[in-house]
A protein has these predicted regions:
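Juxtamembrane helix-loop-helix connectors linking adjacent transmembrane helices
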Residues: 1-26, 33-39, 168, 173
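Functionally important transmembrane alpha-helices
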Residues: 68-129
């Protein structure tokens, strides 16, 4: 494991991942999930459909396989739930940006199967396996699967609790 700090590369990669997050979140959460919710479709079905489409956006990524596709679906659920309950794209955009940026340019993992030339840390994994995600990167790992499920459940729990409280509190006019 090595360390190198290259501010220009870090800033450039941050801008790149910001553009990726903006594009994907505006399209998948802002437009597609927003339109599905506007049809009065069940919010969880809308969330699942938009998440499946998000995963399909990545179908041609290098090293794609079943577990990375599952994790991309779960990532879509996490990002979608954060939009669903905050009603604001800033949270999923920020989450998406920092998720990708920290994985690749900071920690040195592949991001959705894509390798980046420069990272702060250089990881030398003993072998590619389902625990470290192999050639797809951390998003291809079982650890990622567990994290996505846990954090999605937490966001849904928080959001449902928040909605229940807001419905129970009478508004004064």
């Amino acid at each position: 494991t090595g360390f190198k700090f290259e501010p220009v590369n870090l800033l450039g990669s941050w801008v790149f991942f910001l553009l990726v997050a903006l594009f994907e979140e505006i399209l998948m959460r802002g437009y597609i999930l927003g339109r599905l919710l506007h049809t009065r479709m069940n919010k969880f079905l809308s969330l699942f459909i938009s998440s499946a489409l998000f995963a399909l956006l990545h179908i041609f990524n290098p090293e794609i396989d079943f577990l990375p596709m599952l994790n991309l679906l779960l990532a879509g659920m996490l990002l979608g739930a954060s939009y669903l309950y905050t009603k604001n794209l800033c949270f999923p955009i920020s989450l998406h940006l920092f998720w990708n940026w920290i994985q690749g340019p900071v920690l040195g993992y592949e991001v959705s199967g894509n390798n980046f030339i420069s990272s702060m840390l250089t990881l030398h994994l003993p072998e590619d396996n389902v625990l470290n995600g192999g050639a797809f990167g951390f998003e291809g790992s079982l650890i990622c699967t567990v994290l996505m499920i846990v954090f999605t459940i937490l966001i849904v729990w928080w959001g449902e609790k928040r909605e229940a409280i807001s419905l129970a509190v009478p508004r004064s006019y």
